[in-house]
Amino acid sequence: MACILFVIELYEKQLILYILYRMIMNYLFPNYLDNEYKGKKIPLYFFYVIIPVTIIRSFIHLFAPDGGAQSIANIPLYLYSNQGSDTIVHLFSEWGLSQFLFGLLYIVVLIKYKSLIPLMYLFLVIEYSTRVLLAFYKPVVLEGYAPGGIANYFLVPLFVILFILSLKKHR
């Protein structure tokens, strides 16, 4: 009898997890891409802020002479050979290109496919939490604190909250 109750309880837990999984997957990957955002309003409004911040950062990394590596991130480029510092600046420029493309994607989502906003927040959670982990796993020599490095600790929980709110239906 206890075995049967255990199987029923396990089945109920799996069923609940499956239902939650399907609900989240339907929000992240809607059957039809449309411009209908169903989540709370705060994540939508905050998404308007993310776009210019992302594009401005991308332009700094693309067009600043040092790509923002020393002037913003406090990486002491003068400690490296010319080839080494040029490589770092080049990698910052490539990062800027990546940020610019994400900024364009965010614009497309905001204009045409608002139903993908929860997925965009999931990407932001993954990106910024991975940045925090990489700071410990592969630390970089800095002459001070990089503003982005400090901001990541605040942005991860913020993006988690915005992600969760983007999944909740707005009434």
Residue ranges and their predicted role:
Residues 41-64:
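N-terminal signal-anchor transmembrane alpha helix
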Residues 72-107:
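Core segments of alpha-helical transmembrane spans in multipass integral membrane proteins
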Residues 103-118:
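Juxtamembrane helix-break-helix junctions at the cytosolic face
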Residues 119-136:
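Hydrophobic alpha-helical membrane segments
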Residues 142-154:
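Non-cytosolic membrane-interface motifs at loop->transmembrane helix junctions
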Residues 157-171:
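Membrane-water interface at the C-terminal end of transmembrane alpha helices
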